[in-house]
Amino acid sequence: MKKNIIVGQSGGPTAVINASLYGVIKAGLERPEEIGSVYGMVNGIEGFMQDRYMNLSAKLNEEELEILKQTPAAYLGSCRYKLPEDLSDPFYPVIFQKLEQLQIGYFFYIGGNDSMDTVSKLSRYAAANGSEIRFIGIPKTIDNDLIHTDHTPGYGSAAKYVAATVREIALDASVYQQKAVTIVELMGRHAGWLTAASVLARKEVGDNPLLVYLPEADFDLEQFALDVKAALDQQPNVVVCVSEGISDKDGTFICEYGSAAQTDSFGHKMLTGSGKVLEAFIRNRYGVKVRSVELNVSQRCSGMVVSMTDIEEAAEAGRAGVAAALKGSTGQMIAFRRKDGETYELECVTEDVNLICNQEKKFPTEWITKNGTDIGPEFWDYALPLIRGEAKRKMKDGLPVYLYRK
Amino acid sequence: MKKNIIVGQSGGPTAVINASLYGVIKAGLERPEEIGSVYGMVNGIEGFMQDRYMNLSAKLNEEELEILKQTPAAYLGSCRYKLPEDLSDPFYPVIFQKLEQLQIGYFFYIGGNDSMDTVSKLSRYAAANGSEIRFIGIPKTIDNDLIHTDHTPGYGSAAKYVAATVREIALDASVYQQKAVTIVELMGRHAGWLTAASVLARKEVGDNPLLVYLPEADFDLEQFALDVKAALDQQPNVVVCVSEGISDKDGTFICEYGSAAQTDSFGHKMLTGSGKVLEAFIRNRYGVKVRSVELNVSQRCSGMVVSMTDIEEAAEAGRAGVAAALKGSTGQMIAFRRKDGETYELECVTEDVNLICNQEKKFPTEWITKNGTDIGPEFWDYALPLIRGEAKRKMKDGLPVYLYRK
């Protein structure tokens, strides 16, 4: 008997989270004998609990789907909503009743660690309560911090944005003769994957960024001052890339030296300003011209600088999710496995979502070199294939055309 | 008798200042009967006084010239160097001797207000001292604040970057249900042209950015609070675009409420942080989620989001400069005149550089609407043609290929 699909997006936006949505919708449309409609939760599980959803398969035509595939941010809207730990909480019978009413057979949630926690809880409740609804997680995060997957959709485009933008900032910083330090602050609370991507900006060895600091290595202000001085002796224009989440050996975030930290609904520290703190520190210490640049949200939502490899892989993750669910999988996350061999090849597999949720994949400390100021060659081999390929963007009047939820 | 060309770049980088350099070099190469070599000053007039220059026509091949045309920032390097006001200063005989030694007949300086001041002084010294060297200014600034020209090369690409990026930031800001304010701070010390470009981000009337504040209108914190509240009553996600240079009715820069201001060598106030000041103000006032985003240097140095119209016009300005100089012009700046008629057409003319230097073209106050919070339709007609057209970028391994001075 035919069942319906429901799909939601959760957590922070990325450049390709809609490509995964595209993949789920396309795969659903291609299986009319098993799939009725493809519904979308508006604002994730939080919106769905308020009965906010839409029929995507009925609403979107072929052309709109192609635009959706290249639209950044989350078309369905997102949420940061943590499900109750206690599976006997009244929340669960309510949501399962809503799912049954819509004759949902397959539930897909596109997101990161916290979203996989949602998939884990719903699939465990289903198993314990005899529901046949299958729950699959589709990975998504620019932070690239999900375990049991080679990388995550969203990282390749964010890494490409960071590398291209830092290359341009280094060019900009090089136009004057006067000694100057430019500090670029990059996203990544606890994992340095995105900050590491800044080294791809180098066109050759010895290029800026000369110094790169990840959260995985303890940050020491005095050592930093020495590092910057040595770099300035090497060349007049020094570009430094730091993660928003760098902290000292006592675990105090550098940004806390300058600004009070707030906390989001998952208890994450909301970080800003490590770049500003270091800017003031170096200016006061050496009296040189110092500028700090926070790349901010464009890292995750730029649709102008995206990796076509990332878009295609994100779409494939969505398709693979539907295929896995129809084969009977539940409580699984779609993961990427890199095939051995010279050329880059990827396959989609499924991994137990319960082993993935609420875990963080750190940047390998053995890839961090030069006393915590640089990244080793292993990272180039890992990351370069992920940023390749240019999207053929639809433009109108000189601006990108995106799909908006009406 | 054959003479040589020397060309320099001065002031802040733009996405197309190298396209103007390309235009000068190409035009020089096309007139072998009149032009010997095309020299480039390294780091502008400051570097040239240190005998730092290069032979561009001998050094760059056809392929390198095409890459140069699409390379952001300043290939030759730049400077901020103010020539002595007193034309009897020993500086002048020294530099003219250097120019004569190189058999320079034609001097081109690509830059903004301050660079035109350099062209003015050198051309006046030449006239007063019987030198036949001809001095021509090629306009360049993302600020679009040069008078006697329809617009300036560099503005179109910066405006396109701002419009595209604000459109994406608005998309990113719209994914959550919770009320939130995003404040985007844009470049423009005293002229609001670039901040005005943020309204082009709207796909339809009533879209974000809902509020736009330019330096040309007095900024009032209490009125701002009321504007934001009214906007939040309209929709949950409000994007506000402000110029770095907004100031209150007493002329105090809003950023000064929060941070100390520094001064550059031209006496300009170096502004940062109006966005941060307003972020804290609104958060404290209303307790809503507020984020501020400073677009920073990518506005002027992004090569990934550029206007092909801007690139071609910048190259044409360089060519027109050479043509004007060979016809006998000196002490002139190349200016753009928009032809009347339905379709956008531009012609290059020459204007007296002495009337242009050290002047600022403000954004027309009659184009500022809704009590200083929006921009009128005249601006769309003015700006849309300037951001059209996509550059075919040369990419390698997923990253842009640029030309670097060796």
Regions found by a protein language model. Name each.
Chain A
Residues D51-G105, D114, P153-Y155, R167:
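Glycine-rich oxoanion-binding loops at beta->alpha junctions
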Residues N4-G8, L68-Y81, K140-D150, Q177-A180, ...:
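Gly-rich Lys/Arg/Thr-decorated short loops/hinges at beta-loop-alpha junctions or inter-strand turns
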Residues S10-G12, M41-E46, R80-Y81, G112-N113, ...:
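Short, ordered loop/turn segments at secondary-structure junctions
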Residues K98, Y106-G111, D117-N129, I136, ...:
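Accessory alpha-helical/coil subdomains and C-terminal extensions
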Residues C255-K406:
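C-terminal non-catalytic interaction/assembly regions of soluble proteins
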Residues M1-Y53:
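N-terminal phosphate-binding or glycine-rich loops at protein starts, especially the Walker A/P-loop
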